[in-house]
Amino acid sequence: MSRILLAGGGTAGHVNPLLALADVLKVSGHATFALGTSEGIESRLVPNSGIDFFTIPKLPFPRRTSRHILCFPFKFFSSVKLVRSILIEHKIQVVVGFGGYVAAPAYAAAISLNIPYVVHESNARPGLANLLAAHFAKCVGISVIGALPCGKLVGTPIRRDLTAAASFDPVLAKEKLGLDPVRKLLLVFGGSQGSAKINMHMRAALPRVLKLCDEKNYLWQVLHITGYGDSIDVNMPHYSSVRYMDSMGYALSAADLVVSRAGSSTVAELCTFGIPAIYIPYPFGNGEQRRNVSHMESAARIIQENDLSQIRLEDELLELMTDDERREAMSIAAKRFAICNAAQNTASLIELALSS
């Protein structure tokens, strides 16, 4: 039995692959530990999964010259010292990083103690921590060809409960969610943080879209996952909204079309389920979401946030919601982008790092 520390946090895109990999490692008999921050989504999801969880302060790299850049080295080395103590106390044998705020101190601590580490990059464009750390890693796993020049294509690990849900009966899934089992489902979500702009334009577009679909005898309903920051109640026929959903397996199994951000985990999950999508990439960061779906025109429509409007959404939605054959072709194309057994593939890299 090996002792493995998984470092990642901040967004679901870092945390969900961590949880999926932890499942596989536990089945193989490894002792797994997780490192994150107390502020990110991992502070809720990881402890609920039964994994020993350690936190360090959130420490984003300052992108602009300011007093924060002067303090950064001291705070960074303080975090490295904290991670070192965790690695020593729990006799960690390999560190696995998924990027994000906690990965860089974890990599640095591993190097200082001569502990091998593995880098996993889910995005088409890596963040700074993974970009630098990949040069010294024992193994590097990627989800998009070319993301890191030394990377092996392994895919983005998906939680076991979600992969199992890919075979659910969509009608039963709709009933589990309290939805109409006859109407097709448009699922809308803006990533783990939600998106005020997507929420606003979607609510403006839906009344006309649903009305015209009904008139043409294309019967649809909407499940809108708005995010915790949204507090607007909307009374609209065939429209349901929730701030967060724990049972995403049922939601994805029931969905006939999705409107969402283009985070790496979201894209991997939709491809696994074969769901046609309208992606609205998050425009900030280092542009990774745009890159994540730039090669997927056959499986999705892509709207850049600068082009997002009520009229554009109405046009895209109506075109897809009234064309069953096109959605079916997009579904088939999406499945071709899915990488099966990504968690097992990544676990194999860890075994390689442990044995070398």
UniProtKB/Swiss-Prot annotation:
Domain of life: Bacteria
GO biological process, one term: cell wall organization
Organism whose genome encodes this protein: Tropheryma whipplei (strain Twist) (Whipple's bacillus)
Topology with respect to the bilayer: Peripheral membrane protein
EC number: 2.4.1.227
Annotated catalysed reactions: di-trans,octa-cis-undecaprenyl diphospho-N-acetyl-alpha-D-muramoyl-L-alanyl-D-glutamyl-meso-2,6-diaminopimeloyl-D-alanyl-D-alanine + UDP-N-acetyl-alpha-D-glucosamine = di-trans,octa-cis-undecaprenyl diphospho-[N-acetyl-alpha-D-glucosaminyl-(1->4)]-N-acetyl-alpha-D-muramoyl-L-alanyl-D-glutamyl-meso-2,6-diaminopimeloyl-D-alanyl-D-alanine + UDP + H(+)
The entry's keywords: Cell cycle, Cell division, Cell membrane, Cell shape, Cell wall biogenesis/degradation, Glycosyltransferase, Membrane, Peptidoglycan synthesis, Transferase
GO cellular-component term (any): plasma membrane
Protein name in UniProt: UDP-N-acetylglucosamine--N-acetylmuramyl-(pentapeptide) pyrophosphoryl-undecaprenol N-acetylglucosamine transferase
Stated family: Belongs to the glycosyltransferase 28 family. MurG subfamily.
Gene3D superfamilies: Glycogen Phosphorylase B
InterPro entries: GlcNAc_MurG (IPR006009), Glyco_trans_28_C (IPR007235), GlycoTrans_28_N (IPR004276)
Gene: murG
Chain positions recorded as UDP-N-acetyl-alpha-D-glucosamine binding sites: 11-13, 123, 159, 192
Stated role: Cell wall formation. Catalyzes the transfer of a GlcNAc subunit on undecaprenyl-pyrophosphoryl-MurNAc-pentapeptide (lipid intermediate I) to form undecaprenyl-pyrophosphoryl-MurNAc-(pentapeptide)GlcNAc (lipid intermediate II).
One Pfam family, short name: Glyco_transf_28
Compartments it resides in: Cell membrane
GO molecular function, one term: undecaprenyldiphospho-muramoylpentapeptide beta-N-acetylglucosaminyltransferase activity
Major enzyme class: transferase
Pathway where this protein functions: Cell wall biogenesis; peptidoglycan biosynthesis
